[in-house]
Amino acid sequence: MIQPQTLLNVADNSGARELMCIRIIGAGNPRYAHIGDVIVAVIKEAVPNMPLERSEVIRAVIVRTCKELKRNNGIIIRYDDNAAVVIDQEGNPKGTRVFGAIPRELRQFNFTKIVSLAPEVL
């Protein structure tokens, strides 16, 4: 469960290392973001000499949360960190690689490009 002011790791090679959530995008006024939700975030830490810089406002999709994800078949998935992938306005990832395991549910939210870049899909 990601809420505003939550710090997240970045799971791609876009140039950002750490993000802070400032808004959750969705119908109504969602209080928490879960896996597959799009957020507006600010870059808190970035790699030098990369296109993304510190204090830049970007969009990202949540790919891992410490809060467990329950599937319909009874399986519960829990990750060790909160992580996101930086995306553009069309929903395509800005990086060319994705690090770490990615849940299968992202395919249902039309983030197939992120799923195809991932080394492991749970």
UniProtKB/Swiss-Prot annotation:
It is found in: Plastid, Chloroplast. This is Large ribosomal subunit protein uL14c. The keyword Calcium does not apply. It comes from the Eukaryota. GO terms for cellular component: chloroplast; cytosolic large ribosomal subunit. It comes from Dioscorea elephantipes (Elephant's foot yam). The gene is rpl14. The keyword Signal does not apply. GO terms for molecular function: large ribosomal subunit rRNA binding; structural constituent of ribosome. Its main location: plastid. InterPro entries: Ribosomal_uL14, Ribosomal_uL14_bac-type, Ribosomal_uL14_CS, Ribosomal_uL14_sf. SUPFAM superfamilies: Ribosomal protein L14.
